[in-house]
Curated annotation (Swiss-Prot):
Signal peptide: none annotated. This is Uracil-DNA glycosylase. Transmembrane segments: none annotated. It holds the Pfam family UDG. Its main location: cytoplasm. It catalyses: Hydrolyzes single-stranded DNA or mismatched double-stranded DNA and polynucleotides, releasing free uracil. Its EC number is 3.2.2.27. The active site is at D97 (proton acceptor). GO terms for molecular function: uracil DNA N-glycosylase activity. Keywords: Cytoplasm, DNA damage, DNA repair, Hydrolase. One of its GO terms (biological process) is base-excision repair, AP site formation via deaminated base removal. The gene is ung. Belongs to the uracil-DNA glycosylase (UDG) superfamily. UNG family. GO terms for cellular component: cytoplasm. It comes from Ralstonia nicotianae (strain ATCC BAA-1114 / GMI1000) (Ralstonia solanacearum).
Amino acid sequence: MTRRADPAQATLFDDDEPAGAPTATGGFVPLADQFDALPADWKALLGPCLARTDWPALCAFVDGERAAGKPIFPTEVFHALHLTPVDAVRVIILGQDPYHGTGTVDGREVPQAHGLAFSVPAGVRVPPSLRNIYKEIEAEYGRKLSAGSGNLEGWAQQGVLLLNTVLTVEQGQAASHARRGWERITDCLLEHLARVGHARVFMLWGSHAQAKRALLPEGHLVLEAPHPSPLSAHRGFLGCGHFRAANDWLAAQGQSTIDWLRPQAD
């Protein structure tokens, strides 16, 4: 089962407006309202995590930054959770914080970040780390990816959760929202996700992601490699074989595999 357009999310955002732009009511969408618009399965999983953390303080910080006129990316903070139901998640690829830069689509400047780790909106130039991810997939399968887009919503629709450990960032300020409360929430989400339903694949690239291994109980496939950044990809990410390994393991578990050569949505 996959999700396509989510009516609750669609009512919050206008796709014709850039990230951080005012809504039809003249303001941004508060973070708490974005949580309230989540599908019921993710609200049930994430709700206890918010109760264990200082969620009101995080909301006040993010909303306050936006109210002050700072461009905060992405607009749709929980976009990844709208695309893949909890029970459909078979692979988790863990990122760090959202892209803090912008790209150009049809002459318009847009944020690179759109709520999925490593992914960018269609039309935005594919970032270097994602180019290395594509390069590894092509090497493993001996085929070129057909599309040049960096939008990974097709993977999300197949059951790949592309999750950053920090879900917001200020434009041009890398890690500007780190240590504001997101890490405790996403740690809790990972722990809960690892303890419900079927076994899953966790791809942990780089030391930041690998530090989360302690959150994961036995029974899952945990794949570790250096980060796909150009600074580290040649130290073991390229040649890691993670994508075929994930599919081999999923097939052995009786689960559907991922078509890694189809990153874009249908």
